[in-house]
């Protein structure tokens, strides 16, 4: 994932948490904030309750892969994906479905792509 597609600074994370809207399902919470830019930016947070560093990094890699696969469908907003406990035990396909579901609930998918439930 290119650096231009990442939310990295603490100031940006805090702005999204403070001024953005949140949406959640059982496995993910998404905070999103509309910004005037030509592409999306994403931050990923996996807490220490999820497991050891190896497990957390594996979860982050899977989330990053799903986000980049859906990249052409995402609206130009900043958003933060927070993984909840239990996400570490999901297979890739289940993680993809859960993440797609919460993005759809947050209305972060462009019109026309929302009907594509399964890939």
UniProtKB/Swiss-Prot annotation:
> What Pfam families does the annotation carry?
Ribonuclease_P
Q: Which UniProt keywords apply?
A: Endonuclease, Hydrolase, Nuclease, RNA-binding, tRNA processing
Matching HAMAP family: RNase_P (MF_00227)
Disulphide connectivity of cysteines: none
Q: Which Gene3D superfamilies match?
A: 3.30.230.10
What family does this chain come from, according to its entry? Belongs to the RnpA family.
Q: Which SUPFAM superfamilies match?
A: Ribosomal protein S5 domain 2-like
Quaternary structure, per UniProt, is: Consists of a catalytic RNA component (M1 or rnpB) and a protein subunit.
Q: Can you name this protein? A: Ribonuclease P protein component
This enzyme catalyses:
Endonucleolytic cleavage of RNA, removing 5'-extranucleotides from tRNA precursor
What GO molecular functions are on record for this protein? 3'-tRNA processing endoribonuclease activity; ribonuclease P activity; tRNA binding
Q: What does this protein do?
A: RNaseP catalyzes the removal of the 5'-leader sequence from pre-tRNA to produce the mature 5'-terminus. It can also cleave other RNA substrates such as 4.5S RNA. The protein component plays an auxiliary but essential role in vivo by binding to the 5'-leader sequence and broadening the substrate specificity of the ribozyme.
Please cite one Gene Ontology biological process associated with this protein. tRNA 5'-leader removal
The EC number(s) this enzyme carries: 3.1.26.5
Q: Name one GO cellular component term.
A: ribonuclease P complex
